[in-house]
Amino acid sequence: MHQTQPSLFGKLMTMFAGFALSGAVLAAPAAAPSATPQVEIKTSMGDIVVELDREKAPKSVDNFLAYVKSGFYKGTIFHRVIDGFMIQTGGFDEKLKQKKTNKAIPIESQNGLLNNKYTVAMARTGDPNSATSQFFINVENNDALNYPGRDGFGYTVFGKVIKGEDVVDKIKGVLVDDKGMFQNIPVIPIVIKSATILKTPIPPKQ
């Protein structure tokens, strides 16, 4: 999914176990980062929880979490919605102003994760190594986006929706229009209110 450009898509705790030795307190090593962190994305149409795959897409996951931790996604909109394809967000505010991003990351599309329905993937320009903050949720199985794709690279999947699939389905069906350089933009803005890492992960579905 092309990244839209201005000119044109339990609880984590640090535990310290120490003991006094000659007046010094020794701390236990911090817990390793979760291999499957979960992020709750609260939108104006409902809440979505995504589970990330750090093992298969480490750079993409760490990049996404950095934006989440900084509060970057608050106030961004779903600026491209195509029923039968995907819903895209993470780059523009309600005034359609593009937000300043961090450095682009390398593509990880050869990780074996597929652009199937309800998976989360990085948006980018024609440059395979141009992904920054924008991401999209596949609303169907999009085989054409898998590596190598039509351009020889495909699109990096780094997670999946594990709660709020109904919200994704509502978003994909909204009325859209073209506005300036934006195509398929919702007529009524769909806004991300917050994106936060869940301290208590949702257990796997039985």
Regions found by a protein language model. Give the residues of each.
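Cyclophilin-like peptidyl-prolyl cis-trans isomerases
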Residues: 2-12, 16, 23-206
